[in-house]
Amino acid sequence: MSEPFHRILGRPEHPLFLFGDHASKHIPDGFDNLGLSGDDLTRHIAWDIGTEGEISGLAKRFDCSALIAGFSRLLIDANRDPEMKTLIPETSDGTSIYGNVNLDADARQQRIEAYYRPYHAALGQALDRLTPKLSISVHSFTPKPDLGAQRHLDLGLSLIHI
């Protein structure tokens, strides 16, 4: 199994903490790319394009800590409540995610335990340990999703003031 997250350590007293729930397009071995083509795995449906590099670059530049999910949102969406139906999507922007269709409760729970919970535990520990003044969840937005209207936003930042 691949790691469910990648931790970047900066100065512990730094007031800024960055994290990326959708920064990776990685589908671990054993999931047969969820039945998708390589082209689909490079599209915005698999990840927030460019955010891993932005998070890494900003963390290095500011010497702050960061956390990056190590799996694609198509495997399990780290930015969803575990009870939500969209936690493991069966479709994304008109594309069927065959490896997620009719997933049984045991397989769903295995993904939660192997990827979702470790990532969120690491996120919670980082926020507790670092006590940042500003946590930024970094996301990117495709200007025109296949089935959507034109977006006029290149980078989205969800701010959590602590």
Residue map of PLM features:
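N-terminal catalytic or cofactor-binding beta/alpha core of small enzyme domains
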Residues: M1-I160
